[in-house]
């Protein structure tokens, strides 16, 4: 057994072979490497599959034996300081390794076809393999030094992948925004690491936890300073996992290719913050108030992400805000001490969200056959609709992922989310009300996305659409057009003439079509995983002997509430309540977004009935306020732009003016005086060498005389 663990250090290095081989091939055999570029997708999948098989084997060993293995190699610089490098294999490591590899393999298979015609095909697979390697290095790290190194590499890869199409201004701005926002969190993480090293004198996790626990127990450390350092560590997780208030980069990150979005949202970048908090949970548990702070940030993010997703027209941005909200649930669970619930939801959400993003990519791929390559149009749900008959497999996959995310039994997210919801009542009734209420919001906005995309008729021809996109901080109307009023109140109905026909249609010669098998296979496999993965964590109290997750996590459980058993009656009661809330959200989404014109030939009667009702007017005002809030991203981006970006620019202008008018002028004066002096000496000596020598020896003699005189 120990021999197996000794080879675990290769986990992050195996995927790293792909970028190294591609780089060497482009240097030595550039033409052959480019001509055989499709071969590299197979290499990427093969190497990541090796890591997946090894990770699964380690996980089976841990489930059977419940062992934790750590290897540390010390590099002694002097007697007082040494750097330690190594790797840690525990349940958290094995869970994250399996998530990264399984989702990564499916995304790579999908990407082979999705990126087939892109000129940056080789660059894409280089970045993706490096991304997986960096994430695997992060999850196997045994100390803060390695965590920070791989943390920065993950951030670098996200910058490269979000800005993959860097010639597009939107993508270039998005990757910069993500990079700068994460720098705030990374700086906090660095300060927190240095603070805890100053307190404990160690970077290694297990040793640091033990020392800090002893110091706090004996009251030999300032609790205020320890709490501050812990909060700084958590700031790093806030930025990476797009939690409030450092969430602003996440929707703009959708400028990258869709497979990247699937990997980022399922198992890598945003999961890194959850992983960090889970890894440091023994540290946070012994520090007063920090756990409440974690749960508070999480519950704010749960509600904020759900409300901002209510009015998105870009299908990928709607899913991005969904990710933000679901990550908030995981943070709430970690803040409550429900370690198992948080990791369970991390697992189920990863596969469900990967399925949704890959299905969304398939939809975008099919829309490009009609409107050409235009992300502003191909991702806009307003011009979609009626895709069920064109992409039936993709539609089924998206529907299954939607039902899972809504918490509909027996799909994956139902089991994990209900566990978090049940624990929330024991922690805080206020938090519980928000968490349970957001279940309805989640069901509403997810079925809104589904209905706008797949139901009704294809809306490419309607004239009320403009694909023009705004800057992230600008408001955007329902139809994607900039304006003072971002909401069209009668958003369910398009402009029609007296006969009930569309006023303006754009003719198109082709229909959307289903994606190829290499894009459908990962979706079908994820459908199966989404259906069965939740059964791994069914509590034993329900009469099913399937709770593999608890046995898997047994060596590293830090739970607060799972000492209480849950009987079948209580479980069914909570299931009925959460399911009822979810179905209410689905029902409201159907009322608002189910195309009424599918059953009626003319819109005139329907429009008149809706417009003459007083309740309709009041409802429209409420809808307008909600949509205005959502479209303007709760005005948080605007606030940052006005109070941070603009102020920094003004300050930089002041510094620039000071530099030009004061600093530069001072040095220019010295330069001018030197020029005058040199010109004077030149004319004084008539530009002859004997005169220069005379003045030289004259002044040297004076200097020597004064020196010896003193």
UniProtKB/Swiss-Prot annotation:
Coiled coil: none
Topology in the lipid bilayer: Multi-pass membrane protein
E.C. code: 7.1.1.-
Gene Ontology molecular function, alphabetical: NADH dehydrogenase (ubiquinone) activity; quinone binding
Domain of life according to the entry: Eukaryota
Entry's Gene Ontology cellular component terms: chloroplast thylakoid membrane
Main location: plastid
TM ranges: 9-29, 40-60, 89-109, 125-145, 147-167, 185-205, 221-241, 258-278, 280-300, 327-347, 354-374, 396-416, 425-445, 519-539, 571-591, 657-676, 689-709
Any single Pfam family the record assigns to this protein: Proton_antipo_N
Family per similarity comment: Belongs to the complex I subunit 5 family.
Job description of the protein: NDH shuttles electrons from NAD(P)H:plastoquinone, via FMN and iron-sulfur (Fe-S) centers, to quinones in the photosynthetic chain and possibly in a chloroplast respiratory chain. The immediate electron acceptor for the enzyme in this species is believed to be plastoquinone. Couples the redox reaction to proton translocation, and thus conserves the redox energy in a proton gradient.
Protein name: NAD(P)H-quinone oxidoreductase subunit 5, chloroplastic
Organism the protein comes from: Ipomoea purpurea
């Amino acid at each position: 057994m120990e021999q197996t663990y000794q080879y675990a250090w290769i986990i992050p290095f195996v995927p790293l072979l792909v970028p190294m081989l591609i780089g060497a091939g482009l240097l030595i055999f550039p033409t052959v490497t480019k001509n055989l570029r499709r071969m590299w997708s197979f290499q990427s999948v093969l190497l990541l599959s090796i890591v997946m098989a090894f990770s699964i084997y380690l996980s089976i060993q841990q489930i059977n034996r419940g062992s934790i293995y750590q290897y540390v190699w010390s590099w002694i610089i002097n007697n007082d300081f040494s750097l330690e490098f190594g790797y840690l294999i525990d349940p958290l490591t094995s869970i994250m390794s399996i998530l990264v590899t399984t989702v990564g393999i499916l995304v790579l298979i999908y990407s082979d076809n999705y990126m087939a015609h892109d000129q940056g095909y080789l660059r894409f697979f280089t970045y993706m393999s490096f991304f997986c390697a960096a994430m695997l290095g992060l999850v196997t790290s045994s100390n803060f030094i390695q965590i920070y190194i791989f943390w920065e590499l993950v951030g670098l890869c996200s910058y490269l992948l979000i800005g993959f199409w860097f010639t597009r201004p939107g993508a270039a701005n998005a990757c910069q925004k993500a990079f700068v926002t994460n720098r705030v969190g990374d700086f906090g993480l660095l300060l927190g690491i240095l603070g805890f090293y100053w307190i404990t004198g160690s970077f290694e996790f297990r040793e640091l936890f033990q020392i800090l626990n002893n110091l706090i127990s004996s009251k030999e450390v300032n609790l205020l300073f320890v709490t501050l350092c812990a909060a700084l560590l958590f700031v790093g997780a806030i930025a990476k996992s797009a939690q409030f208030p450092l969430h602003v980069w996440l929707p703009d990150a959708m400028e990258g290719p869709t497979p990247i979005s699937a990997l980022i949202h399922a198992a890598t970048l945003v999961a890194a913050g959850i992983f960090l908090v889970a890894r440091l949970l023994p540290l946070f548990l012994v520090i007063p108030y920090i756990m409440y702070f974690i749960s508070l940030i999480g519950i704010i993010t749960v509600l904020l992400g759900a409300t901002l997703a209510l009015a998105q027209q870009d299908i990928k941005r709607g899913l991005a805000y969904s990710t933000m909200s679901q990550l908030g649930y995981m943070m709430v669970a970690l803040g409550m001490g429900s370690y198992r619930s948080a990791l369970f939801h991390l697992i189920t959400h990863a596969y469900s969200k990967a399925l949704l993003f890959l299905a969304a990519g398939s939809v975008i791929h099919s829309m490009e056959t009609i409107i050409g390559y235009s992300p502003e149009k191909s991702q806009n749900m307003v011009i979609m609709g009626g895709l069920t008959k064109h992409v039936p497999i993709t539609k089924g996959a998206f529907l299954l992922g939607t039902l899972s995310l809504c918490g509909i039994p027996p799909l994956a997210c139902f089991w994990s989310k209900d566990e978090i919801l049940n624990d929330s009542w024991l922690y805080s009734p206020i938090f519980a009300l928000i968490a349970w209420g957001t279940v309805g919001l989640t069901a509403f906005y997810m079925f809104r996305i589904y209905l706008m995309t797949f139901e009704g008729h294809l809306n490419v021809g309607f004239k009320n659409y403009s694909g023009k996109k705004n800057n992230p901080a600008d408001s955007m109307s329902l139809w994607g057009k900039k304006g003072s009023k971002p909401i069209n109140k009668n958003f369910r109905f398009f402009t029609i003439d007296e006969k009930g026909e569309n006023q303006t249609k754009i003719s198109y010669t082709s229909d959307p079509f289903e994606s190829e098998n290499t894009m459908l296979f990962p979706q079908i496999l994820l459908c199966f995983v989404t259906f069965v993965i939740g059964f791994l964590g069914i509590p034993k109290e329900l009469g099913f002997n399937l709770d593999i997750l608890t046995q898997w996590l047994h060596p590293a459980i830090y739970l607060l509430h799972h000492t209480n058993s849950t009987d079948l009656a209580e479980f069914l009661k909570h299931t009925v309540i959460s399911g009822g809330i979810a179905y209410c959200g689905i029902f409201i989404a159907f009322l608002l977004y189910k195309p009424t014109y599918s059953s009626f030939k003319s819109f005139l009667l329907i429009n008149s009935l809706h417009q003459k009702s007083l309740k309709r007017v009041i409802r429209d005002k409420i809808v307008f306020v909600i949509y205005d809030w959502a479209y303007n991203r709760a005005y948080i981006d605007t606030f940052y732009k006005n109070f941070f970006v603009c102020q920094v620019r003004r300050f930089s202008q002041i510094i620039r003016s000071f530099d030009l008018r004061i600093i530069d002028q001072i040095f220019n004066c010295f330069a001018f005086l030197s020029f005058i002096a040199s010109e004077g000496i030149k004319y004084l000596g008539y530009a002859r060498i004997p005169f220069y020598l005379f003045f030289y020896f004259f002044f040297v003699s004076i200097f020597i005389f004064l020196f010896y005189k003193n």
